[in-house]
């Protein structure tokens, strides 16, 4: 591989790494924040007629009468919504990236994720948190597109290296996301 091609490949793999890393950090950063978030939303809008109030009543009806049980239930619901949407949208984003190009789809999904994270930071109501997780889950299909991009820019001999970059980004995202969320929850 010539030097300019290798340099372009390294730069592109670096961007793929950053894309996947930020996606996983965004997914996992909320995990340690669930107890504080849910406590806040239950206290501020936990009455009947609100989304969190209805979920709170359902959790108590199912025997989730402790904060821990409610946190596990709500955290599980939000994580499941995110993962389900990622599962549904991965093939959609993949097909679109085949037609429109990997870069365009990665740009769209990164912008969507950035918007959802920005809205999440300023979410004054629980339904906004749910909405941001829905949008983020839809955009998380970009991991499949990033993997395809890594395969596109590597030849058969280098493909393992390209897939390793994606795998390392996922692993480090799951390491740093909860740590950042934990630090934020204790601040």
Please report, for each region that a protein language model flagged, where it lies by residue.
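Glycine-rich segments within core transmembrane alpha-helices of 12-TM secondary carriers
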Residues: 163-181, 185
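Pair of pore-lining "gating" transmembrane helices in MFS-fold secondary transporters
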Residues: 9-50
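Helix-breaking motifs and short loop linkers at transmembrane-helix boundaries and internal kinks
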Residues: 101, 122-127
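Central cavity-lining transmembrane alpha-helices of secondary-active solute carriers
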Residues: 75-93
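Cytoplasmic helix-loop-helix junction between adjacent transmembrane helices
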Residues: 132-170
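C-terminal ends and interior cores of transmembrane alpha-helices
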Residues: 111-124
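Hydrophobic core of transmembrane alpha-helices in multi-pass small-molecule transporters
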Residues: 21, 116, 127-141
